[in-house]
Amino acid sequence: MPKIFRNNGYQTAVIGKWHLSGKPAGFDYWKILEDQGKYYNPDFITENDTARVEGYATDLITDYSLDWLKQRDTSKPFFLMVQHKAPHRNWMPALRHVNKYDSIQFPLPDSYFPNFENQEAAEEQLMTIYKDMYEGHDLKMSRAKGTDELASNPWTNDFDRMTAEQRKQWNAAYRPENDAFWEQDLHGEALARYKGQRYLKDYMATIASVDEGVGKILDYLEAQGLDENTLVVYTSDQGFYLGENGWFDKRFMYEPSFRMPLLMQLPGKIPQQSEVNVMTQNLDFAPTFLEVAGIEIPKDMQGISFKEVVYGNKKELDRDAIYYHYYDWPAFHMVKRHYGIKTDRYKIMHFYDDNDAWEFYDLQEDPKEKNNLIDNPKYQEEIKMMKQKLDSVQQYYNVTEKEFEQASEKSIENAYKNFERMRGKPIE
């Protein structure tokens, strides 16, 4: 997509998280984080250099993006991707926001303590907040009262790269909460709920800087008179669990991680405060953005432009199902390989590799996907229809047998052992 925009006279840039192999292609300018990036004093890669920059990643990405906007060639239209690390693991807030939500008790989801029935893969994952999070690395909990030494923390470099002054302020902000925790002597359900609160408070404090950064960019566009003719898109690459099923992270095809935020602004074209209820995917972004810009959409693009839908000229897309396929196994969180489709009402998933399990949900009757209906006789016609539709979608996307290769038993065994070693002794 950036190549197409550049070939049509646009200035193009990407700033922030890249997390792909190779250098960015099709961009006139790029300044990207190394790998996932670090929250504090991150390393930035440019065409001819890699340098560590003192500061907070979200603020730096915002500032670099504003600098590029101010220095761009104003005679050309532009395409800019601002890609934040936040709120990726391990949710380290800016120093000014560390204690932002200390006085708040966030409501935990009803499913925080789940009862999985006929959901084998959901039961066997390793992404439960109160079982699998590293208390030091993820929750910033200390090893004992009166010390700043962190509890389980297999990746010390996230904190070690802080300057002495940054670490001093960080420890001063977290020490009172950590000491108060050890005084409470929590166990069982109370401890599990406490860990959920720690996670949510850090997560929300981390995204506070994203909110500020987005606001600064929107303010700049308005101040320069660019807001009336600039499509602004706020989105992500997936959803995220904030305690649903007791989980953090993503990966599963269940709704909290399958759905993702998508906010768009283009005054005079997209009706204000309008809401669109159609099934879109991130592969639809490229054809949509190109059509908005009046650029021809290449015939080999698999996505569908939803321009006319967000403009309010159409209510439906030419799509009755969306496809999902998760391959990363054995890997972090040990979410089993699975694929499936979703329609307006139903969802079917097949978990495979070291298991063979189907799940089927009526999202109208069971939006939280608690009741796997795969064996329910009342739904066998719908299940048959969904399996046929799944086959046709896989044919459309040319899904090959190579994508169903199984992991070796040894690799799975080694992964479990490795994660157990990294987990260390939990606070119980």
Q: What residue ranges belong to the model's regions?
A:
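Short, charged, surface-exposed hinge/linker loops at domain edges
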Residues: K402-Y416
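Residues forming the ATP-binding cleft of Hanks-type serine/threonine protein kinase domains
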Residues: Q364
